[in-house]
Amino acid sequence: MEGECRVLSIQSHVVRGYVGNRAAMFPLQVLGFEVDAVNSVQFSNHTGYAHWKGQVLTSQELHALYEGLKANNVNKYDYVLTGYTRDKSFLGMVVDIVQELKQQNSRLVYVCDPVMGDKWNGEGSMYVPQDLLPVYREKVVPMADIITPNQFEAELLSGRKIHSQEEAFAVMDVLHRMGPDTVVITSSDLPSPKGSDYLMALGSQRMRKPDGSTVTQRIRMEMRKVDPVFVGTGDLFAAMLLAWTHKHPDNLKVACEKTVSAMQHVLQRTIRCAKAEAGEGQKPSPAQLELRMVQSRKDIEDPEIVVQATVL
């Protein structure tokens, strides 16, 4: 990579395992980025374990950290990456910081994973307070350049339901009009052309031509479903999409193929290791299902393409 590319990543931190900043920093560093991490929480482990302990950063503490960077004139970034946030005032402070950074650097790219909820058995539910939704809709998404919602989050943000691929792209057009040039719906319950064993993801990238007109590239990807429930995959996805869109800014197809293929390598390695540790016929524990990130370094750096994207 030519020159230094620096990312401010505001996400959660765990002592053990890989979620939030722990899932984002390693792949970004492997791919050549400098990463400055603000830990929105510091927990012993993710909350899928039986027990966890830790601390939560307040909006005032976030402001103090940023003011420290500013006082030393080192608040200069090429990218901002944000993920799970539970607190409205904290999210508001993130908005203020990103606005200021964008005023300093008009080329700064803000990558936002608008973590709000998901669908289980066809029913969607939010796992953050509902008062975060208007903040995402009115302030966060209009500032973002790249967003990575799942289907339920895309529906929440747009106020529209998705029952087909056509409706999904109509929702993505609504999201484009709100602000972001790149929208990737990371998972959906839409039927895949490859059958019920596959999960469908969709991407849309709006590009401006020199004459001022816009052209939109749309893609579809099908990934084989995996059995265990992993934690941190969304954080890993957003970080790698940041990296690969930086390296392929006008080719969402290639950026998504590299991102999703690297994800598949990490997940398959994690499944193999977890099953071996758990033993024959035993269900792996949350600790055994932690993403095998370090062991997947070469796959993250140069992924063999195992998932092809279809340009639509």
Curated annotation (Swiss-Prot):
The active site is at D235. InterPro entries: PM/HMP-P_kinase-1, PyrdxlKinase, Ribokinase-like. Pyridoxal binds at S12, T47. It is found in: Cytoplasm, Cytosol. Its EC number is 2.7.1.35. Pyridoxal 5'-phosphate binds at T47, G234, D235. GO terms for cellular component: cytosol. The keyword Manganese does not apply. It catalyses: pyridoxal + ATP = pyridoxal 5'-phosphate + ADP + H(+); pyridoxamine + ATP = pyridoxamine 5'-phosphate + ADP + H(+); pyridoxine + ATP = pyridoxine 5'-phosphate + ADP + H(+). Belongs to the pyridoxine kinase family. Homodimer. Catalyzes the phosphorylation of the dietary vitamin B6 vitamers pyridoxal (PL), pyridoxine (PN) and pyridoxamine (PM) to form pyridoxal 5'-phosphate (PLP), pyridoxine 5'-phosphate (PNP) and pyridoxamine 5'-phosphate (PMP), respectively. PLP is the active form of vitamin B6, and acts as a cofactor for over 140 different enzymatic reactions. This is Pyridoxal kinase. It comes from Rattus norvegicus. The gene is Pdxk.
